[in-house]
């Protein structure tokens, strides 16, 4: 396989384009959560609680659903500490070795997990269809940051500027709001299909050709002109297969959504998650193809993480409420407490999913420890 080598131009210490990621994220979190809490508190007439396991504290009717989000916050803080410790330790390692990577992106993952805990806690003050967007925004953002972090490991010189990334996130949030105000509207999902197609074409070309293609080229005529000038290298088969898989899934999801409009928030969350999983598996396969390996601790962590994810999804699917049903129908789904006589199924989902996310973020952090002693310029890019 004819791959390029990693460019040594990245810093890996928080400078450059990635340095502002966590700073922007904190600012976004403050300005997003503040009005969100106001909306949730003053929109308390349609709240869906598990009537068989709701423990009130003050004016909060289901405090157990709120406090169980503390695990996201604690794991986020712990992860930031781990990243800091690793960064300090890395300063003593031979320079210009291993994958470079922007440490700022890892700090952003920790911040995103903390913000997910805060936003989910706020949402559970009054769980409803309208408020559901607040429960998933930072989950989606964390998934997108994970994809970017994995990509950045071997493409540090091509890291997207923070403001461009958050502009994309802004459009996702805007679409989420439009979907809430126009549920099931054909025009919305038709527009989504066109947008998906547009992003798939330009995104695929950018990911395939790399630095030869400028991300700022967004018009069709400019695209055709630029493609004619690109080098005609031998096909990068692994990358081509990855893009085919991603495009098949994403296009299929867009067609399904246009034909049978689902809930947009859940839809975009699933599409983002599956894209991340496909890319992660692709990364692992190419590590092995190129003679790299994984430490046994990483393999064990991946095994445990898979079990936690499966268990978390079980408790999430076995729901005790449904915010998309009328309140009376949702109340009939109530289930008894399952943990310590205090926490219900959804609380267990919070605990298990927070644990799974924490382990996965650590896997991302330590994934390439096996090549720490290899000169950066000799590490293949994929």
Predicted regions and their residues:
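Long, hydrophobic alpha-helical transmembrane bundles and adjoining juxtamembrane helices/loops
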Residues: 1-382
């Amino acid at each position: 396989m004819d791959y390029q080598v990693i460019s040594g131009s990245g810093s890996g210490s928080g400078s450059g384009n990635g340095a502002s990621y966590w700073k922007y994220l904190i600012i976004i979190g403050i300005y997003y959560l503040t009005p969100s809490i106001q909306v949730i508190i003053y929109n308390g007439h349609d709240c869906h609680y598990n009537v068989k396991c709701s423990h009130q504290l003050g004016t909060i009717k289901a405090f157990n659903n709120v406090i169980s989000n503390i695990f996201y916050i604690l794991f986020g803080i712990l992860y930031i500490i781990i990243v800091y410790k690793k960064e300090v330790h890395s300063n003593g390692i031979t320079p210009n070795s291993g994958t470079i990577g922007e440490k700022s992106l890892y700090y952003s993952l920790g911040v995103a997990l903390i913000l997910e805990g805060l936003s989910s806690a706020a949402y559970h003050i009054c769980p409803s269809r309208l408020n559901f967007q607040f429960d998933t925004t930072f989950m989606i953002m964390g998934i997108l940051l994970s994809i970017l972090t994995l990509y950045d490991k071997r493409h540090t010189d091509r890291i997207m500027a923070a403001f461009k990334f958050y502009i994309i996130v802004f459009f996702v949030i805007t679409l989420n709001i439009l979907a809430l105000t126009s549920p099931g509207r054909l025009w919305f999902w038709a527009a989504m299909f066109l947008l998906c197609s547009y992003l798939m074409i330009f995104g695929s070309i950018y990911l395939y050709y790399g630095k030869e293609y400028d991300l700022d080229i967004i018009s069709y005529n400019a695209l055709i002109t630029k493609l004619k000038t690109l080098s005609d290298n031998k096909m990068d088969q692994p990358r081509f297969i990855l893009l085919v898989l991603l495009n098949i899934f994403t296009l299929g999801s867009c067609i399904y959504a246009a034909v049978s409009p689902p809930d947009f928030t859940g839809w975009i969350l699933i599409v983002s998650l599956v894209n991340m999983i496909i890319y992660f598996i692709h990364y692992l396969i190419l590590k092995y193809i190129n003679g790299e390996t994984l430490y046994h601790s990483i393999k064990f962590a991946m095994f445990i993480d898979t079990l936690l994810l499966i268990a978390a999804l079980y408790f999430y699917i076995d729901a005790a409420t449904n915010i998309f049903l009328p309140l009376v129908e949702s109340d009939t789904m109530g289930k008894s407490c399952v943990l310590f006589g205090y926490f219900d199924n959804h609380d267990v989902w919070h605990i298990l999913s927070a644990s799974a996310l924490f382990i996965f973020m650590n896997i991302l952090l330590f994934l390439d420890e096996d090549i720490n002693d290899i000169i950066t310029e000799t590490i293949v890019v994929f």
